[in-house]
Structure formats: structure tokens, C-alpha cells
């Protein structure tokens, strides 16, 4: 059962009596919160070099959380779906400061080989360029998603840090 707002069943300000179903609803809400969906997040806090005009998969180095064995360090670029379903995948990437070119972040799934999220923007001249990208994708068990980046500064640049999370939304 999905979350139910208790205020829709009982409004203390109106003097309505608590319905008998309220106890069941609260119990189901607590079970929903306790049995959270499959989710994982990882980060990279060290520099990863990105060559000019080269699409590169980001490699994550630190697990932030993982309740379903979705991110595995032997494959540090991949977030794996443990069961079939719809998933939200989100990433945030910070490129080193440089005055020129574009910075791009793609979200790619292994089943189709295509991207389901993309964000491009011009570099900022005086500060690092940070990009957030997210998308919803249908995955089968053991499919995986990755974050890819590219930059066109004319030089080799680094990614200062990156974070990504995969969350199962439902079946």
C-alpha cells in the first residue's frame, strides 16, 4: 500500500471521530516506511580526468548507502537493478573551472544502450561547472545504469566530485 495522509481520515479540529480503519492505515503507513524501496547512492571525492571531446563513464569510489546490493565496487561505474521495475536515477557532477567549451552529463541504461537523461551547458569562466541530471527508466533485474560525461574545453579537465543515486519507484 502507498502512503496515506492521516489528515484525510481524521481531522481533530472538526471533532470528527477516528474511524476504525485509522489503526489499519497507520499500521500500513509504518510498514511502508519500514520496508523502504531498493535504493543506493555512491560518490567520488577525488579527481577523475576527462580528456577533451571524449565520452567517459564516471567511476564512483565511496558508497553512501546501499540497501539492495545495487552498487558494487568491482564495477564502480554501474548501479544495478535488483528487481524489475521503474527507477529514478539522479547524478550531480562538478567539473574543474575552465573558461571555454561545453560540459555534458548523460544517464545511460545497459538494456537499450541509449541515454534517458542528458544535460549540457556552457562552462562558467570563474568557477567550477556543476550539472545535475535525472531520469526515470524501466529496468529488468540485473540491468544497470551509468553516468557519462564529456567536455570540450580543448584541454584535459577533471571532475572534482560526483554523486549518483538509484531508487526503485515501483513495478
Where are these regions (language model features)?
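Extracellular jelly-roll beta-sandwich "head" domains, especially the C-terminal globular C1q domain
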Residues: 2-171
Amino acid at each position: 500500500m502507498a502512503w496515506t495522509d492521516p489528515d484525510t481520515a481524521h481531522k481533530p479540529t472538526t471533532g470528527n471521530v477516528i474511524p476504525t480503519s485509522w489503526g489499519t492505515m497507520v499500521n500500513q503507513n509504518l510498514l511502508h516506511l519500514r520496508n523502504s524501496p531498493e535504493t543506493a547512492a555512491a560518490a567520488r571525492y577525488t579527481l577523475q580526468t576527462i580528456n577533451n571531446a571524449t565520452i567517459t563513464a564516471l567511476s564512483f569510489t565511496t558508497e553512501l548507502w546501499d540497501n539492495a546490493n545495487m552498487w558494487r565496487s568491482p564495477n564502480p561505474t554501474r548501479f544495478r537493478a535488483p528487481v524489475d521495475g521503474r527507477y529514478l536515477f539522479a547524478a550531480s557532477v562538478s567539473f574543474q573551472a575552465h573558461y571555454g567549451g561545453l560540459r555534458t552529463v548523460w544517464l545511460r541504461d545497459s538494456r537499450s544502450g541509449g541515454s534517458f537523461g542528458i544535460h549540457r551547458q556552457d562552462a562558467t569562466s570563474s568557477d567550477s561547472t556543476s550539472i545535475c541530471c535525472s531520469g526515470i527508466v524501466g529496468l529488468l533485474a540485473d540491468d544497470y545504469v551509468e553516468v557519462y560525461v564529456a567536455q570540450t574545453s580543448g584541454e584535459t579537465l577533471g571532475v572534482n566530485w560526483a554523486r549518483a543515486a538509484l531508487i526503485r519507484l515501483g513495478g
